[in-house]
Amino acid sequence: MKLKKLVLCSLLTGALSVSFTGNAYMAEAVSAAAISTDSESQTTYSLDFDASQNYTEESKTVNGQVVKYRAYRNIVYVSHPKNKAAQSMNIFIPAAYFDNGKINDYTKKTAPIFMPNGVGGYMPGEAEEPSEKGHHGDGANAALVALSKGYVVAAPAIRGRTTLGADGKTYVGKAPALIVDYKAAVRYLRHNKNRLPAGDTEKIISNGTSAGGALSALLGATGNAKEYEPYLKEIGAAVERDDIFASSDYCPITNLDHADTAYEWMFNGVNTYYMAMWQLQDLANRGMNVPGGQTGKPGLPPKAPDANAANNPTASKQEVQMTKEEIAISKVLKDAFPAYVNSLQLKDEQGNLLTLGKDGHGSFRDYIKDKYMQSAQDALSRGLDVSSASWVKVKNGKVVDVDLDAYPAAATRMKAAPAFDKLNLSSAENDEFGSENNTPKHFSAISKQYESKTGEMADSETIKLMNPMNFIGNGKAVTAKHFRIRHGAIDRDTALAITAILALKLQNSGVDVNFYSPWNRGHAGDYDLPELFNWIDSICKAK
């Protein structure tokens, strides 16, 4: 294992006002026309939505406004699910549309369809529910706000890396299952465009955070790509298009096969780290070694984390020192990043080529600096104090520079090198690329070359299907017309460079991209819902 031998090729709902209508609603109900057999894998489910069956009329309050809606739950969106619960969808429709009413200038025919996913940490995503309390505890969640704005909400459950099949043994949610399910849910909606009481299936907007943000971006980038067809056919997805109108992506953990190099380009030289609590839980739950000997210590929850824990991580207070091997490979990864950036031939808004020299400096680095400067300046303009950020230089009330060399120590490192494709195959991402018998795999060239004795490499097709960069601008897949991408200024789950590369690639391919790094924001999503829905309104109502 010598470095010189490397080839650098790189919800529960809240209080409800409920009246039962149609057939009595049951918590475990699924869509009609299931052929009953002893085995779930042999059951065939109808793909035809029936608006007259199994719904409840409910209401909740948003900012003093009573929001009434009809709820259809547990709708199986494929005909041959690998796991029924993980491949079911909730659909919520504003009540006004059943009386031909209008909300926010939308009618039942023009209402956008908001399609959030609950994926985090590449774990299964539960079907979202409207709630008066969001993940941040400061108001309604995205699903309920969407309903208040007149949107139809279609919230699919999605398989993740821990999803088991009907036999209780086979892992059926490994890559690329999550994107296959998200596409299948879109196809279900299109299949039922004339059966749904409301919603414009040409105005579907995805939304997700962290791994869910990556999933949302992947859905937006890969519309109708033929490479996914065998997987969609296997689960009995509707034979329809799966391109969408717009994609909202919070802190996407994406471009995984290059994310390690970007992380070390940013954090190389910082040799201590603070893991997220959900990562410690995840390692302990899978029987993996927990760095720093934290296994079993007070405060480490014994149960497996859920997706929301990954989407809103809490950092451990224990500082862990990187090993000599991790420090060594950090430099290897850092040195590999410029070649990758230069291969992309990215350009900024003015058409300037963004590149890096072998030392890691160059116009791409300046572009990243500008994003942080814009974030800090906007904070200053809103009257916020940025003086605690030692890496930001302010003169006469204006941000004049940011020190990218000082930023990593100030933000702190969350992950040891490699951040994603661990040499010991211990990361959530290694698990995501694992086999049906739950054997984790490598997915990046450098990690595989460095650890070549025991770890198996995921197949190249699966790796391709998980990275939107392989489809944007390829002339074959249909990319969403609009993207909104957010990456917090102190998010260190992945490097801002990775999110910037995604945004630039989309922008260079003619996509309308709204990309921003909010000040003092870590790894999280749905924290700016008024701005999110103003953006959706602006693109949906544009003439």
Protein language model annotation of sequence segments:
Residues 342-465:
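Long, low-complexity, polar/charged, intrinsically disordered or flexibly structured peripheral segments
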Residues 116-180, 222, 521:
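Cap/lid segment of the alpha/beta-hydrolase catalytic domain
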Residues 19-34:
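Sec-dependent signal peptide cleavage junction
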Residues 171-195, 528:
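Alpha/beta-hydrolase active-site loop
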